[in-house]
Amino acid sequence: MSNLYESIRKYKCGYIEEILNILDMFDPLLNKFQRNSCYEDMKSELSLFMFNLIDNFPLEKDCFKEDKFIINYIYKALKNKFIQVNKLHQKIKSCESNIDIVALNNCDYSNLLSFVIFEDIIKDLTQNEKNIIRKIYLDRLRESEISRELNISRQAVNKTHLRALEKLKKLIN
């Protein structure tokens, strides 16, 4: 591996072809992240991230005069981006599967969009709160019906419902 510090410095001075050398140095790492991800565009996503990372690289810091610190910095940044992209991809897949479930129930587009927005709004509630909110607003059940179904008191359902609404109010504001 040639001097990474010099390659980054040359790239920042205008030698555009140096970015290709830097990407080649980290190609095995990018391939590893690609293999470990179920997201098919992970390598290109991380390559684009590397362009931004190198553009904003803090070469003026003294600790980045040695390659080992630069390599570690880039590795950690790529790993964090890998985790972030994977989480986002999983979230998108989850929403897509929810959309598929709703679509199977013969809902029209506006109901589908409303459902996705509704699920996004209640994502920060506890499972019990989500369950009660869904039953009240999606299934249109009364609190007494929910209490019989869940074998809890109507007051407990009401209390959980009000607590969930307060949480949602705080999240929105």
From Swiss-Prot:
Keyword terms: DNA-binding, Sigma factor, Transcription, Transcription regulation
Molecular-function annotations in GO: DNA binding; sigma factor activity
Pfam families, A to Z: Sigma70_r4 (PF04545)
Keyword Transcription carried by entry: yes
Domain of life of the native organism: Bacteria
Disulfide bonds: none
InterPro entries to which the protein is assigned, alphabetical: RNA_pol_sigma-70_dom (IPR014284), RNA_pol_sigma70_r4 (IPR007630), RNA_pol_sigma_r3/r4-like (IPR013324)
Family: Belongs to the sigma-70 factor family.
Protein name: RNA polymerase sigma factor TcsR
Phylogenetic placement of the source organism: Bacteria, Bacillati, Bacillota, Clostridia, Peptostreptococcales
Gene: tcsR
